[in-house]
């Protein structure tokens, strides 16, 4: 199947990773709203005076408690204001990377003056929806993002509609890389990872550079819940073993600490999430260092991890009640297992054990506590790999795990897509009651 480096399936796999694994500064739900505000502001000639915004319940959930980088403030209003006043409309998920201290001060002043509002979009059939309407005198511009964190579907100003996205364009062309990926299998992904030329996937090493830098930053300071730094102290005190398992736990947690605490460093995201990118990257990096892997082996392991994470997550809603750090960690389990022995059965067993272990962990919004879930998921991934290396795994006789790993994944995703919808509504209701 893989005779040529020009194999079209390889190209689709690589494109899928390039589409879904991107740098992102700050939690991607507030950033999505910041991007809408920045694009709207770019359509205006005058000084921005006010911002009104509307978001879906799921985006509200993931924006209530997370720190916006550089501001020291949490929530969607500061993201909307800073996007409008200091955002780079052309930078996608890095929209806030060049925001100046002056723009941050102006954004805080705009909030204090009561000139920023963020409301629930009701009714709203879209899981991921953000709309920002930015005003300058009598002029205004409104930008709507739907379905993906950077997927702008409409731009309108006081002079009329200037852009609407047509859905038919991509369908008339060839099938999207994600659609192609969803119709393959973990075995085909593994075959690709083993055979693709290194030069074609070298780019994935940037994930190690960016997320490794976040991890180092998390260990330096008191970002977020500073789980990584705290566990490192406990390790030095002899309360935690100084071993590979602990290194995975500490370094992965630290990256998420910095990410959720508002560090002004980008994460390499996966499936629109910085924490998913961290979870799919850092554990694999730590194991690669332990086994002395060179750049090529690290790149192949990271490619397997990120592709597997995308493959699983694509079967889920973009945002749901299921914590997607768990599915990203299933990718990490695949990457770590590949580094340890490379066998498909080891990878499949590790993922099956993950599904039998951390399935059902809820997403209760983006916040500092995400780093707890990231650390739990990373630890579970390594535990599952250790079991698989000894030919032990949760079997198809137990719970939602099936005898086939592909069916196990389908069972997990069915839970998130159907049964957990009421869980999501309940979580949002609880969080909304706390906000009032």
From Swiss-Prot:
Disulfide-bonded cysteine pairs: these are none
Pfam families in alphabetical order = SDH_alpha
- Domain of life where this protein originates: Bacteria
Q: Name one GO biological process term.
A: L-cysteine catabolic process to pyruvate
What InterPro entries would the database entry show? Ser_deHydtase-like_asu, UPF0597
Q: Which GO terms describe its molecular function?
A: L-cysteine desulfhydrase activity
The family line of this record is:
Belongs to the UPF0597 family.
Q: Which HAMAP family does the entry link to?
A: UPF0597
Name of this chain's protein? UPF0597 protein CKO_04510
What is the organism of origin for this protein? Citrobacter koseri (strain ATCC BAA-895 / CDC 4225-83 / SGSC4696)
């Amino acid at each position: 199947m893989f005779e040529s480096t020009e194999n079209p399936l390889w190209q689709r796999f690589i494109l899928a990773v390039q589409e879904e694994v991107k740098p992102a500064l700050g939690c991607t739900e507030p950033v999505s709203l910041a991007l809408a505000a920045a694009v709207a502001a770019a359509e205006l000639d005058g000084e921005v005076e006010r911002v009104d915004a509307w978001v879906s319940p799921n985006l509200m959930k993931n924006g209530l408690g997370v720190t916006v980088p550089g501001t020291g403030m949490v929530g969607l209003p500061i993201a909307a204001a800073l996007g409008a006043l200091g955002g780079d409309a052309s930078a996608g998920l890095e929209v806030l990377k060049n925001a100046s201290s002056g723009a941050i001060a102006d954004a805080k002043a705009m909030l204090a003056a009561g000139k920023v509002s963020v409301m629930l979009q009701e009714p709203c059939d879209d899981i991921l929806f953000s709309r920002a309407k930015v005003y300058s005198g009598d002029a205004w511009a409104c930008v709507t993002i739907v379905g993906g964190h950077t997927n702008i579907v409409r731009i309108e100003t006081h002079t009329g509609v200037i852009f609407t996205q047509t859905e038919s364009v991509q369908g008339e062309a060839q099938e999207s890389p994600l659609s192609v990926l969803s119709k393959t299998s973990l075995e085909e992904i593994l075959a690709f990872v083993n055979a693709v030329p290194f030069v074609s996937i070298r780019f994935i090493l940037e994930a190690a550079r960016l997320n490794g830098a976040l991890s180092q930053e998390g260990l330096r300071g008191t970002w977020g819940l500073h789980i990584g730094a705290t566990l490192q102290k406990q390790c030095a005190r002899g309360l935690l073993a100084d071993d590979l398992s602990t290194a995975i736990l500490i370094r992965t947690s630290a990256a998420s600490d910095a990410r959720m605490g508002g560090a002004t460093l980008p994460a390499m995201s996966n499936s629109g999430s910085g924490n998913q990118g961290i979870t799919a990257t850092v554990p694999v990096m730590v194991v690669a260092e332990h086994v002395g892997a060179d750049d090529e082996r690290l790149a192949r392991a990271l490619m397997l991890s990120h592709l597997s994470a995308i493959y699983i997550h694509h079967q889920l809603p973009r945002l749901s009640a299921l914590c997607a750090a768990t599915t990203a960690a299933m990718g990490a389990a695949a990457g770590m297992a590949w580094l340890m022995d490379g066998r498909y059965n080891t990878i499949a067993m590790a993922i099956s054990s993950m599904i039998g272990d951390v399935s059902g962990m809820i997403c209760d919004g983006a916040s500092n506590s995400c780093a707890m879930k990231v650390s739990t998921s990373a630890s579970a991934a390594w535990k599952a790999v250790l079991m698989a290396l000894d030919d032990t795994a949760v079997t198809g006789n137990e719970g939602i795990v099936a005898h086939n790993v592909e069916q196990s994944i389908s069972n997990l995703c069915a839970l998130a897509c159907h049964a957990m919808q009421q869980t999501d509504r309940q979580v949002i209701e609880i969080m909304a009651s706390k906000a009032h």
